[in-house]
Amino acid sequence: MTAEEIIQQILSKHPEVSRNQILENLEAEKSKTGGLIADETLLRLIAARYGVEILQDRVYRKLSISHLVPGLNDVTVTGRVVAVYPPRTFEGKKSGKFASLMIADKDAVLRVILWNDKVELIETGELKAGQIVRFSHGYTREDRKDKVELHLGNRSQIEVEPKNIKADEYPLIGKFATKINKITKAHENIHLTGTVKELFPASTFTRSDMSTGTIMRFTLADETGEIPVVVWNEKAEELGKSLKINANLQLVNAKIKENTNGKLEAHVNSYTYVEVSERLDF
């Protein structure tokens, strides 16, 4: 808050006080401190004497997703929501619920975990894909795949569409997609959009520990090319019931691998967000 804004707040609460009186008080304080303290700080002291509370501005240290590391305990980060996963419950010594979502800025994508009461923002539809959201007082952990993720607990705060941000620093969801002809082995995790061109039925297989799994394959195409997609386990069971030829598809956090023939494939697992839509603009 500027010095002028503080003066205006004092005047609005105490119209009997003149601007000159405030400035005289300011000069007196400056002479006492030898000019070593900023005018804004001195004016806050003067305001307090008049019983006027000047709230501190909320200052957020800008932290990009790519700078996050596991083990941080008081993190504030902002991103555009690109995927929202359904809430889940858990049982044990304590029971509760959690939900996860994916956010992104210009540099990277981050998985965010909401715990217990925070999940209500997803259940009520207040928090959804496409929004810019600021997450404050979170903590970072390493997931099972050695990726950093952000957790939001009781003391955390979530601000949907904060006012003091630049929207152009958080591209729209479609801008995160990589064109198929630009995919390389260097893309470990990727966001893709396209149309289903070939679709093969889901099938089961037996693992080395004799447990069973499910696999499904299809071909995804955009205006630049095509790529085979391999879908695993619960995602295969889910898509096997609903996916059709010519369906428009969005994949967030798919994994790129080489098959036995040296060709690139996109792999979809529980970490991948899948959205089927009627129409998709490239």
Residue ranges and their predicted role:
Residues M1-F282:
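Single-stranded nucleic acid-binding proteins centered on OB/S1-type folds
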